[in-house]
Amino acid sequence: MRRSRAFIPTAKEAPSDATLPSHKFLVRGGFINQQGAGLYNFLPLGKIVLEKIRAVVKEELDLAGCNEVQLSFVTPIGLWERSGRSEAMGKEMLRINDRHQNEFVLSPTNEEAMVELVKNRVTSYKDLPLNLYQINTKFRDEARPRYGLLRGREFLMKDGYSFHSSTQDMIREFDLMEETYKKIFTRLGLDFRVVAADSGAIGGDGSKEFHVLADSGEDTLIVCQSCNYGANIETIDEFKDKIDELNEKSYEELKELKIDQKCSCGANLHFKKGIEVGHIFQLGTKYSAALEANFSDENGRSKPFEMATFGIGVSRLVAAIIEQNHDESGCIWTKESAPYIVNIMVSNVKDEAQMSLGEDLYAKLRAAKVDVIFDDTKERFGFKMKDAELIGFPYTLIIGKELEGGLVQIFDRKTKESISVESSSAYDKIMELIK
């Protein structure tokens, strides 16, 4: 992409209601803009990031043997009444009527719809296990939408549902999805913890949450720095009467609090703030029994499916990545999530030598399937550089006055360090860095 053709409306000021870094920088960097309360449009850069995250999620799920589907965003209220969740979801579930006064729901999740899809289509234990997922729009009518993409009303979510002939097989799939989720978040370059959690309105006997560690997180966790142990304080009896008090404390305040007990590995435990980006549940027969979704076992007996459900906040991950990776200048995207991993910046577009080299490197990187943007605009160098830091391209290749001596600069967004390299070896150096 040439910057002169790209729609990237950057801004100097953040919205007045933006308090979190991700909200400020995603709007200022031209990734998103607000359509209404808790409703956001994804602009070209934001859409690229969203699709890159979606691609990682899809690739790992497909490798784990999951099947992608796409369900209707609108579901009949009758499904929710039969499962008993039409009341449990409360006002977060937005109901609508069609011209015939039939009542529908803008789906906040899809357990009921997925059970209805499988019901009478999967009838034998021989067809199990089965894991179906979608990456689709959801809507929850949040009372106080805030924090940009972290607490919106409309969002993109991956929701998956597995069907089994036994509890043991359901637990096996639950464990497989836990490992698959770990692979997804690791590929995205995130520091995260898996913690025991409360099942809430979804229901079921066991659940785990996946939290990106960030100072701005709404949840308070107890984590061990020596092993992978983590727990949401909501699940620990010792802290249940202090949940509101601890959740309201800042990360700096939590750092000063001491936890008396040790981790099972012998190391000290610490409070951390987390942003929930994934949640997996062991549902048992809660939904299949309520919706009379049965299969025939090896003895010909009719039984309700054992189920589990698995969710990832795909659009929430866009914000969570920046909450964990930013500085005072703007976004710092991880390599897997960056809209463009290389930004070629020509300091003076009127200089034929600079433009010629820029065009040559741009063509070579595109031929090598590198996600590259070529800043061929006539803006001042300082303006271009500030925009590059705000947007957060991992590497900016600067072609400027040093070219007279045969050199170009490569700026690393994460370290903010620049190196000078021979212009003839710039391509090879970039390819080495982005591996």
Swiss-Prot record:
PROSITE patterns: AA_TRNA_LIGASE_II. Its main location: cytoplasm. The keyword Cytoplasm applies. It is found in: Cytoplasm. It is an enzyme of class 6 (ligase). GO terms for cellular component: cytosol. Its EC number is 6.1.1.15. Keywords: Aminoacyl-tRNA synthetase, ATP-binding, Cytoplasm, Ligase, Nucleotide-binding, Protein biosynthesis. GO terms for biological process: prolyl-tRNA aminoacylation. It holds the Pfam family tRNA-synt_2b. It catalyses: tRNA(Pro) + L-proline + ATP = L-prolyl-tRNA(Pro) + AMP + diphosphate. GO terms for molecular function: ATP binding; proline-tRNA ligase activity. It comes from the Bacteria. The keyword Cytoplasm applies. Catalyzes the attachment of proline to tRNA(Pro) in a two-step reaction: proline is first activated by ATP to form Pro-AMP and then transferred to the acceptor end of tRNA(Pro). Belongs to the class-II aminoacyl-tRNA synthetase family. ProS type 2 subfamily. Homodimer. This is Proline--tRNA ligase. It comes from Sulfurimonas denitrificans (strain ATCC 33889 / DSM 1251). The lineage of its organism: Bacteria, Pseudomonadati, Campylobacterota, Epsilonproteobacteria, Campylobacterales.
